[in-house]
A protein has these predicted regions:
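Generic alpha-helical scaffold signal
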Residues: 18-21, 37, 67-68, 101-104, ...
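Glycine/proline-rich, flexible active-site/cofactor-binding loop segments
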Residues: 21-25, 29-30, 108-119
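Generic hydrophobic, aliphatic-rich segments that mediate packing or membrane embedding
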Residues: 23, 57, 70-73, 106, ...
Length: 331
């Protein structure tokens, strides 16, 4: 059997460099001229040959993190696939981008950050029909893995979707702090006068210590937006100050930046494949491409946009020196 003509590094570098088009055909077209250059079939086989494994992402991410500093942020994002009728892994999920339930592939990521870093350390692809695991199962598996790897985060921040009692108790068992948003109907006891929904309790932006049903003492901050929307932020650190809550909440926005970055600059939504194995391998390679892009930008003090633009700048300069497309008379 002939050896493979391309490997995962070839595909990762293609993802970093290509501006929009992600296909095996395009990957083959842009290969440097050489003997035995990989054809499009080589990249198609690559995405079927690799073993999808989140451990590979961690192997590269661990060089970018500090286990004893920073925070862990967990959230999911939907890779839009509104017209994919026969693509595997596509199910219906809530999209924060569209503010509606849409068709797509759901990616759950555990991100490490110190505010200015964006390092995906672990991830899961939602496929309940195959593995029978819910998003909360993935949440717990990734945090158990993070604890086993030696993480000691200053805080774990996550969306209210994951604020169930089992998840809160798991984080407490690690002796970690958590910060999340609770729904207004969560039952608390603020004054030993019985359980009431959060919406019926007198709360303020300064926070108040209450007893969460089934859990114990927590501190809840009531945040009222300028448009009247109300959020109830909660933490198991009952002495947490307003400034500390704001600090960790701002740090947690890094995962939203990561979601946009991995879609816009690593093109995680754009693979022209159908099978779940190919999609899993494409997603893993995109996260590894993002790690390289993020590391380069952090050490050189530039944005992801600038780094991506710099790749094609030389090609634009060469074209301007010798334009190929001219106006040819037809009359």
């Amino acid at each position: 059997m002939n050896p493979p003509k391309c490997n995962d590094e070839d595909y990762i570098n293609f993802l970093i460099a290509t501006p929009r088009q992600v296909s095996a055909t395009e990957a083959a077209r842009v290969q440097p001229e050489r003997e035995e250059a990989p054809a499009h079939d080589a990249f198609t086989r690559l995405l079927q040959r690799l073993e999808p494994d989140a451990e590979t992402v961690w192997h590269e991410a661990q060089t970018q993190v500090s286990l004893a500093h920073g925070i862990l942020v967990l959230d999911d994002s939907t890779l839009d696939k509104p017209y994919a009728k026969k693509m595997e892994l596509v199910t219906r999920h809530w999209s924060g981008k569209h503010h509606a339930v849409v068709r797509g592939i759901n990616l759950i990521t555990l991100l490490w950050t110190e505010g200015d870093r964006h390092v995906p350390c672990d991830y899961r692809v939602f496929d309940k029909a195959q593995d029978h695991l819910t998003k909360n199962d993935h949440f717990q598996h990734m945090l158990n893995t993070a604890q086993g790897r030696g993480f000691q985060p200053a805080c774990v921040v996550f969306d209210g979707w994951y604020a169930g009692l089992d998840n809160l108790r798991l984080i407490r068992s690690f002796q970690w702090l958590w910060l999340t948003r609770l729904k207004s109907n969560r039952k608390v006891n603020p004054d030993r006068q019985g359980l009431r929904p959060l919406s019926a309790v007198e709360l303020s932006e300064q926070g108040r210590v209450v007893w969460l049903e089934g859990y114990g003492l927590i501190r809840v901050f009531k945040i009222v937006a300028t448009d009247g929307d109300i959020e109830y932020w909660a933490t198991n650190k009952v002495e947490m100050s307003v400034l500390e809550r704001v600090k960790w909440a701002n740090f947690a926005w890094a995962i939203e930046h990561y979601h946009r970055g991995v879609k816009q600059f690593c093109l995680i939504e754009r693979a022209q494949v159908r099978s779940k194995r190919a999609w899993r391998n494409h997603i893993a390679c995109c996260l590894r491409a993002f790690l390289r892009l993020e590391s380069h930008c952090y050490h050189h003090g530039i944005s992801w946009f600038e780094a991506k633009t710099a790749i094609i700048r030389a090609a634009v300069r060469a074209y301007l020196a010798q334009p190929l497309y001219t106006l040819n008379p037809t009359a």
